[in-house]
Amino acid sequence: MKVGIIGAGTMGAGIAQAFAQTEGFTVALCDINNEFAANGKNKIAKGFEKRIAKGKMEQAEADAILGRITTGTKEICADCDLIIEAAIENMEIKKQTFKELDDICKPEAIFATNTSSLSITEIGAGLKRPMIGMHFFNPAPVMKLVEIIAGLNTPTDIVDKIKKVSEDIGKVPVQVEEAPGFVVNKILIPMINEAIGIYAEGIASVEGIDTAMKLGANHPIGPLALGDLIGLDVCLAIMDVLYHETGDSKYRAHTLLRKMVRGKQLGQKTGKGFYDYTK
């Protein structure tokens, strides 16, 4: 099966790796230009270099995986069997991307979006084929869960096919109903937002909050470190979707979160968030 990944950022590159490291899959990793797409593949290669240096991976295995990934713009997705969009969490960008792909891809290609919170039905509205949600978690090559979300017009056979594909690459698919944030992010992101509020109120330090949740709630990573890993811009986007879709004030993003995003302190991806990653 040939899989087209649209968006070669953190999630797109991770999803590409998850497929390419499984025999039987080839990947077309795409972005708005060739350089961005190549950067995504290079990110995967650099991760492999670290694993090889630690003796956790053989060079031949890395070469085989990278050999299954081609890069370019969306035009190289014309013959793909499955398209997974992993672009920025913006409804209009996603809709426009799929509108263009609808004319490029073969009729039998399945369209899936990796959106973490947006409406599957709305993303797929007006397309010549159905849409399905296939939500991976960061880091995509490692995290086992894939949330499978059917839109209003998603046929059962498409749902079954995507579940099978998820299992084929070693993931555990969980079907959830279409709702803002689905399951994981509807629980997780407000928790991170609450942790930001606790820090802003001076109740505990960043390290104190994360240590408390790791030792007191048995979380493998603290909420503020997790926010940095996810990307504070992504956290804000999800909070805004939850708030606008539900109108419930409990989903209102904390002002500190918004301020940090405006200041480009997004976490690991920019080198600084609640922790400093430049040291």
Name each model-derived stretch.
Residues 12-15, 94, 116-120:
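Short glycine/serine/threonine-rich phosphate/pyrophosphate-binding segments
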